[in-house]
Each structure stands twice: as structure tokens, then as C-alpha cells.
Amino acid sequence: MDSSDLDKGLTIDEIIAKCIQSFDKDGKLSDPKLVQMFLMMHPWYIPSGDLAKKLFALSESGDNVERERICQFVRFWISEFPAEFDLNPELGEQIRDLKRALENKGNRRESSLIDIESVPSYGWKRQVTQRGPGGGRVRKTSLLFDHLDPAELAEHLTHLEFHSFSKILFQDYHSFVLHGCTVGNPVLERFIALFNGVSQWIQLMVLSKHTPQQRAAVIKQFVQVAERLLQMQNFNTLMSVVGGLSHSSISRLKDTQSHISPETTKVYDSLLELLTSSDNYARYRRRFATCKGFRFPALGVHLKDLMALHVALPDWADKAKTIINISKMRQVYKVVHELTEAQRLEPPVKANPDLLNLLTVSLDQYRSEEEIYQLSLQREPRARSTQTHAKSPPSPSPPLEEWASLKAKPDQALLCQHIEKMVESVFRLFDEDGDGHISQEEFQSVRSNFPYLCAFNEIDQNQDGKISKQEMTSYFLRASSVLDCKMGFIHNFAERTFLRPVSCQHCRNLILGIYKKGLKCKACGITCHKHCRDHLSIECKKRSKSVSERGESMEKGRHFFFTLPRSFRRSTLYPDLREEEPHMEDDGVFDDHL
């Protein structure tokens, strides 16, 4: 690659010509880095369909040598990025047109180089609801989370998150960088929801225990999980686990802290030190750079890099937007290439499909920050001396904030299939006597996996003292509907006195009178009568207070905002935080755009 050309930049046509000229008649590449970089990065500058049209036009006007090089270029494109041709039918058809045109002109040798029909299906990369592949022997005792080996739990968490990570394509990164959020990006949205789900599930598992000793034992177990994740070089799930353990609802549990051993504290501190954001995550970057074999990057850090590059450097080197800024292209390519290389290596673990089903549902047991904090207060109430302090809430999740304020909402049919399969797993694993029902004793084992499962009698609809598959399926479907499929963002209503006429979004009647109180959602601002609350079917769409570079308001709607880890506290397992009363803004809760 001529460095002088790169320094001054290249037009689209110039870089296409350079890529084509990199191939000899035998298909050998003289500059593979340039070709690989352009084929990955070209959608940033030109749609794939337009690139295919340019190649078609060049093949029509070129000589035999030129046509053969073009076909070698297309062949390399298909071999390196096959998913593009399966997931983009228009692009696939354009390449077929090129192949047919070559055949019609008698260029069968060149045409034979283009084999698009052998491209496998990549539809699974666009499926948001995930299913784990089979493997492993069913062991009932290992599926109780209280007794699950930390290494095994770390491996299954790795399997779940990496499966979701492997679906992310270049177009998803590109969309995220352009919008600054996951608008219209369900694959990345689901990945973020899973990341947040792990963090929140850890908080719920700790808070599900009633004594400080039990909670300390759960914390120790998850620190051991984090150790195993580090051994596996899974930095993404490691960040999620550390974020859950350092959440303010856990860090305020002083009685629990007193039962955590110095050894556990030392391990935890070392993990915090590794993941600190100091010097732009320098410690994590150094550690990740030395990794060989399977490695799972902390995606949030690398997305931050992409955002920073996009904001700092222009796409084009001229005002007319005809000359590509090759410097930016190379830097963005380096980040994305590192992520795509990590996707190629499968984790060296075998997954138990029944455990994956239970774990997936457990991770989707959505609770609001306020609900979790209130549960924390129930476990360890405030000391009297702290009750007079404080008007603003503790930071909701130091050191690692959630990436998103919204969970992905799955297709209803897929949700039903997922719940039915999960129920089958529950009965296969916990129906000890094989009578097709869950007894009260067996129900206690099931509840270990779902700390906030309702009472036995509420699931046992016919009150015969046992739960059938139909009753359990019905319960989960019912619960999913109430909680917006356990993954959606439900309304966060608060009483409000309206000083001007406001209409109810359910019955459309006015909420009138100075002393007439109604309800207003703190997230999306929707209003309704108290008696209409349970009948309201409108989805909560959290408002954005974001401003683009041009000062324009970002699009309001159902999308994600991404927040990165902040600096970790280093001295102790949990810093001495002053407890403060949870507080919400009167007019709404907003997300800040990067």
C-alpha cells in the first residue's frame, strides 16, 4: 500500500481500482490488508449494492485480464464476508447478474470464480431470541443456583453472552456509531439487555437471601465466578458481574460486608483494578492485548472507541466528500477487525441446554432500580443516623452503569415457545418422581432459580396441591404480560396534581380539578386516571434529552443509550457510602446521549 496515496486520501473509484489491481491472474493478493479493510469498511462510504454496480460496469468495459481480476475480487469478497450476500438479497442478485452476464459473453472461466450459491444461511445472526445448543449431561443438583459450581456458572454465562455477541455484524456497529444509540438495531439492543440482565440478576440473587451470612456467601460465589471469567478471558461478562456486585444496593449492605473474608476482598479489589477506567481502561487494554486463543472483549470499551473516532475524525478528506479519509478508515477498521476476529473463536465450553433455558429466563426477570433499592432497604434498614441525611439517591450502579434503560421486547410467538421449552426443562429437572406435576417440596427447588417466583397457591390454579405443566406455562405467560414480557420497560407511575386540563391516555377523558390527582409516568410522561392504570396498553417509550452535534434534539422513541464504566473505588470491597433517600425528578427521568 503506497503510504503517500494513503496520506492524501483516495476516492471510491481509486480505492476500488487499487483493490482490483492487487490480484494477479492466479488470485494471489499483493496487498491483502487494503482489500480486507475496504471490503469490511466500504458500507461506511458506499452501499454494497452500489459497489456491486461499479464492479459490473468495470467488467463490461474492461479487457479479459481486468475481468478476471474483478472476479477474483468478488470471489474474495464472498469468501471473507459471506453473511452480506445472504442477508442482503439485492446484493446477492446483483452478483448473480454479473455471473450471468459473464456466462452470456462466453467468459465461463471467469464466471466460475463467482460461487454465490454455496453461501450458507446466516438468518440466525438476525434472530434476537436465542436458544443454546445442546450438550452436557442433565444433573439436577447442578441446576440449583445456590449449589452450582462457580466455574460451571461462568461457562454458561459465557456461552449465553458470546452467542449473542457472535450475531453482531459491521452494520450494527455502524448504526450504533451513526445514531449514538441502538435505534433500529435489535441485535445490539438484545446484547446490551443481556449484559444488563446479568448485572441485575446478580443483585437479585444476593438480595434474595435473608441473612447477612447467606448474602456474603452468594457474593463470594460470584467473585469466584468472576475469577473463572477472567481465566477464560471473558472480559465482557466479567464487567457485568463486577458491575452487579458493586451496585449501590449491594454496597450499602454493611452487615453483609462484615461476613466477607479478606481473601475474597483481595480478589475483588484486583478485578476492580483491572477494569478501572483510569487512563482510558489502560489496564484492561494491556491485559486484552496479551490474550491468545478465545477472548471475549469488553464490548462497551470498544464501542466507546468507535464513538470517539467518529466524533473526532471526518469521514471525508475534502468538503465535496469525494476523497476518503484513509486515516480514519484504518483506525475504525482496527477496532472492528479486533471485534470480528474475537467472534471467530468459539468458547471452549459445553453448555447444558436445560440450564441455559432456566438461566436465560432468570436473566430476564426485570426489576427497576427503585424496586431493587427498596429490597436492599428491607434486607438491611438504614441506621437512624443516616435517615436525616441526603436528598438525592446514591449512584444507581457504580462502578458500572447499565448500558441501556430499556429491554428488548421479543416476538410473542417466540416468547411462548421459549416459555414452553423452559417449563419442559423445569419438569425434566425438578419433577423427581416423574408424575408430571411439581409438588410443594419440588417447588422449593424450582424457586431457587427464580427468587421472586410467586407463591405456590397462585400457580396452582385448581388448588389440588400440585402444579401441572399447563398451570406453570399459564403463570409465566400471565406474568410476562404483566411485566411487558419480563424484558420490556414498564411504566413508572407517580401521583401528580395537574394544574391544567390533561387527558387520560386510556379513556381520553380529562383529568380535571386542582385537587384531582392522576398518574404520570416518570419515564415517558404518559398520563392516566388511577382507575385506568391497569387497562393502559400503550408501551412506555423513555424520553431522551439528547442533543446531536448540530444541536438538534435526538429522535424520541424506543431505543438504547449507552453508558460506560466509571472509575472504580479501590481501597475496599465496598466503599463507605452515605445512604440517601431515592429521589426522582418530577417531570421525568432522562438518558444522556454520549
Swiss-Prot record:
Residues 377-403 are annotated as: Disordered. Disulfide bonds: none annotated. A zinc finger (Phorbol-ester/DAG-type) spans 490-540. It holds the Pfam family EF-hand_5. Ca(2+) 2 binds at D460, N462, D464, K466, E471. One of its GO terms (cellular component) is synapse. Its main location: cytoplasm. Keywords: Calcium, Cell membrane, Cytoplasm, Guanine-nucleotide releasing factor, Membrane, Metal-binding, Repeat, Synapse, Synaptosome, Zinc, Zinc-finger. One of its GO terms (biological process) is Ras protein signal transduction. GO terms for molecular function: calcium ion binding; guanyl-nucleotide exchange factor activity; zinc ion binding. Belongs to the RASGRP family. Functions as a calcium- and DAG-regulated nucleotide exchange factor specifically activating Rap through the exchange of bound GDP for GTP. May function in cell aggregation and adhesion. This is RAS guanyl-releasing protein 2-B. It comes from Xenopus laevis. The gene is rasgrp2-b.
